[in-house]
Amino acid sequence: MSDSIIAIVPAAGVGARASHPGVESVPKQYRPLAGQPMLRHAVAALLADERVSQVRVAVTPGDGWVDQALAGLPRTVWRACGGATRADTVAGALAESGVADDTWVLVHDAARPGLPAPALARLIDACLADAVGGLLALPVADTVKAGHDRVERTLDRNGLWLAQTPQMFRAGVLRDALTAAAVNGVAVTDEASAIEAAGYAPLLVPGAMRNFKVTWPDDFELMEKWL
């Protein structure tokens, strides 16, 4: 089996939750952090590990920001293969890549620009030695409540993890899992959920606090401090 690794960054969303009222409608992944677009930070974090042979960024057709955002980065290409959902975008990027089924694929959120090199190395090391692959994740530390405007119940946090990215799986397995999820109407919020639905148990690899997903307006200020 091959140890070849590529990365896919789905970057076709608009990030509505991260917008301030009245702020220019620049997609979240292109908003500046520490002087550079957030997407550029996310891609550069993947390029920090030389084992990643290429980073493929999937954008929406007509994207007018990506050329400038990623100009000059090595081992990086971008294609207008973004779909209606994250799963569609990743599936489209996989199909467009043409990689062999046994190639390892890292899928990383454009909104996680704080990925530390040691966490990425941990994930790659662990997955190369595993039959399935896995993801970065953090054990839940806070008390977890279920409810809407009022608490309905408190959940047992024992054994609960917060999924992060990258998530790393063989291209063929991931492609088949995403296809099966689409056919069967399985809700896929990350690649691991598709892999789980296909009957596999992905490896949980300790992530990092600074690898949080920039989601809300205040997250930009916090991430600036990390970067």
Regions from the PLM with identified roles:
Residues 5, 76-78, 160:
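Short, conserved active-site loop motifs that form the nucleotide-linked donor/cofactor pocket
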Residues 71-104:
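Short phosphate-binding loop-to-helix
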Residues 101, 114-203:
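Conserved core of the sugar-phosphate nucleotidyltransferase
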Residues 9, 39, 93, 108-109, ...:
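Residue-level signal for inorganic ion chemistry
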